[in-house]
Structures are given as C-alpha cells and as structure tokens.
C-alpha cells in the first residue's frame, strides 16, 4: 500500500492538470502557430509561469485500491496484484483465465 501522502499528492496533481488544461493548451497552440522568435519567447515564459504540477506528464497512474504506482493496467485502473486477485475471485466481469 502506498503512503497516503503520495496518493493525496497525485490527486492534487490531477486537480491542477484539470484546472490549467485549457490555458496550457491555448498557450501551446499559440506557441506552435507563432513564427516570431520574440513572441515564442514570451509565450514560453507564460507557460513556465504555470504551476509545474499542472503539466499532464507529471501525473502517475496509480492503482485506485492500493495506490501502487507500477504495474497498473489502464483498462481497470488496478495494479497487477489486485487484478489477479479480483479476477480469481470473479469480481471482474468478463475477465477469464487464459487457456489454449
């Protein structure tokens, strides 16, 4: 189980990403379309003024049950350990053990 502080930190990052996503996207689009180096420099400064944790690539996928940061399946939002346990217990509809 991950530390509660790490889980809360990740939730805070998710809120920041949500809050600044429109502004960040607008600035990035303007940066891509602008050709003037001075204007690009100014836009880059504006992007740098945004909170660091508002960048989407700062987020980390975590298991919503245990908070484990590695081995998380995106389709379920579960770590491999919890996924295996729940699949064996039949708690995940449509998930069956592989056989060939």
From Swiss-Prot:
Biological processes per GO annotation: translation
Annotated keywords: Ribonucleoprotein, Ribosomal protein, RNA-binding, rRNA-binding
UniProt-listed InterPro entries: Ribosomal_uS14, Ribosomal_uS14_bac/plastid, Ribosomal_uS14_CS
Example of a GO cellular component annotation carried by this entry: cytoplasm
PROSITE patterns, per database record: RIBOSOMAL_S14
Keyword Plastid: no
Alphabetical list of Gene3D superfamilies matching this protein: 1.10.287.1480
MF annotations from Gene Ontology: rRNA binding; structural constituent of ribosome
Stated family: Belongs to the universal ribosomal protein uS14 family.
Function recorded in the entry: Binds 16S rRNA, required for the assembly of 30S particles and may also be responsible for determining the conformation of the 16S rRNA at the A site.
Record's subunit section: Part of the 30S ribosomal subunit. Contacts proteins S3 and S10.
HAMAP family: Ribosomal_uS14_1 (MF_00537)
Name of the molecule in the record: Small ribosomal subunit protein uS14
